[in-house]
Every structure is written in structure tokens, then in C-alpha cells.
Amino acid sequence: MKTIYLIGFIGVGIRNKQYQSEPGLIKVGHVGINFENDNRILGFHPTPEAINAIGGAREAMNWLRNRKDGNRLDGALQDDTAIFERAYELSLRGARCTVWQQAIEFDSDTFERIREQAYNWYEEQKLFPYAFPLSIEDIEWDNCATFPRRLGLTLPEASGQLQRYIPHLQAHGQAWKPKGAEE
């Protein structure tokens, strides 16, 4: 058996003045996937090009927060290892962003198929519609928490709401530490 990890944290908050200089994903929270024996954590979120096209990070956040209109941006899998490492560092300093992981085991063939698909999409920067959780049923979207379903992973919680999702990682997993972090 081989293991795929769902890794995630609840953000420090978009209005918390102490963290205003932090990247947006630290503020809102994030979920990524990691494959056994791989150092990278892949996360799904808007591409830099999509963010720049709408006028920058603040404008992108405002656009996505308008959920009633079904606003979406182009998103892709990206190497977000540094984001999870930063959340871990902040949690050690008292920020409410403990990083959690849940291990999911697969037979070798299924693991390799999922891993190959994820890395193909990552390398080609395949675009998918990214949105904050929408209740509009006829609009296709994913966010970081729901994207793993595209790879055939069963989600611990399907709403895409990190306030609901992360407690499932916590209940069925363990706290995450970067490779090389002190025990």
C-alpha cells in the first residue's frame, strides 16, 4: 500500500491586522495533497495570471467573495509547500493555523495513476474553474478542499468550507510537520 496525504489548515483571518503581510492562502486557509516519498505539497488555487488579470490579490479576493453571482477564476495545481511550512511556523508562534494531515492508503497501481494525473496537470498547468464554495448547482467549480475529488479521492467533507473540512482532518489524522522539523 502507498499513501496520499490530504494536508490543510484554517487560515488566520483576512481582517487580522497582525497577519496582513502574509499571503492570501495563509489568511483564508488551504488544503493540498502530498504523495508518499515526495517533498512537494500540491494545492489548487487561482493562477498568478488570473489574479493579475483581475487587478491583484485584493481584487481577486473581493471577486471570489461575491458568491451569489458564481464568480470564478482560472485555477491550477501549484507547488504550495512553502505555504504549509509558513502556516506551521506561524502555528508555533501561537497563530490559530495548526496544519493537519490525513493519510489515505491506495494499492500501488491506483496510487501511481492518481500521482501521474496530478503531476501531469501540475506540469501542464491545466486550468479548472476555482471558486469559493458556491451553492449554485449548475456552475462547475472547485476550491483547494474539493479539488482532490477530480483525482478520484474521497473527500473527508464535501462542502469546500474549511471550517467544516479541517476538523475532519484533525479527527481522522494528525498534526503535520515539515520534513526535518524537530520532533
Placement of each model-derived feature along the sequence:
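Non-catalytic ligand/cofactor/substrate-binding and regulatory segments of enzyme domains
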Residues: M1-I139, G173-E183
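Short, well-ordered, aromatic-rich surface patches in folded extracellular/luminal domains
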Residues: R149-R150, A158, L162-R164, H168-L169, ...
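Active-site nucleophilic cysteine motif
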Residues: K27-H30, P129-Q163
